[in-house]
A protein has these predicted regions:
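Non-heme di-metal
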Residues: 1-204
Length: 204
């Protein structure tokens, strides 16, 4: 809230725009709400019945669906729009260069990378030990993917959503491969959160 009050609100006022709250419903479409409703349901199910499969479902919803695929796609889109990095196909028209904003986002990515790595490690352990079938992971993430695509596609102008959807789909596929492939290894945190333009390992 503080960042919103001290950064967004003054700019909105100066530009003659309506000041809104960061939790204003207009910012959350039906697909975004569905992602978090399903995540909440998975957490509630775990509280009711703490089993390996329910743990994996919870990890897949939060650590992989939300904090990994959805968040990473958002960071990629912001970096593409507000800096020289990312994809030239996403931002249409003129966008301000806000490298400071992108640098700040990179700090958030680093923090969330630890969460993603933790979740992937837990899920991979259950799958590779034979406690949970890999189909559970695939089912959860494939169920979330249309909602993730719907979230990152919800732009009325100046954004081409196709590269974002492709990025999210590729990221989800790579996460599943790392978890289900016996010979795969979970990347280090710094590699895990790199965006595509930063390293060839960004698909990890």
């Amino acid at each position: 809230d503080r960042y919103w009050r001290e950064v967004f609100d003054p700019v909105a006022e100066e530009c003659g725009l309506e000041k809104t709250a960061p939790t204003d419903q207009r910012y959350f479409n039906d697909d975004y709400i569905a992602v978090f409703d399903k995540t909440e349901d998975a957490m509630e199910r775990l509280l009711e019945e703490d089993t390996p499969e329910n743990r994996v479902r919870a990890y897949c919803h939060y650590h992989l669906g939300v904090e990994s695929v959805l968040a990473q796609t958002g960071y990629y889109g912001l970096s593409s729009a507000f800096s020289e990095s990312g994809s030239d196909e996403i931002a249409l028209g003129d966008w301000p260069n806000s490298q400071g904003l992108v640098n700040g986002i990179s700090k958030i990515r680093s923090d969330e990378g630890r969460h993603v790595g933790f979740g992937m490690s837990k899920v991979r352990g259950y799958v590779q030990n034979g406690d949970v079938d890999e189909s559970v992971v695939q089912d959860v993430l494939q169920d979330l993917m249309p909602h993730i695509a719907g979230t990152v596609s919800d732009f009325q102008e100046n954004i081409n959503p196709v590269p974002l959807v492709n990025y999210a789909r590729d990221k989800l596929t790579r996460r599943i491969e790392i978890i289900t492939d016996e010979d795969a290894e979970i990347p280090e945190v710094d590699e895990l959160v790199k965006l595509d333009e930063e390293s060839s390992a960004a698909a990890d």
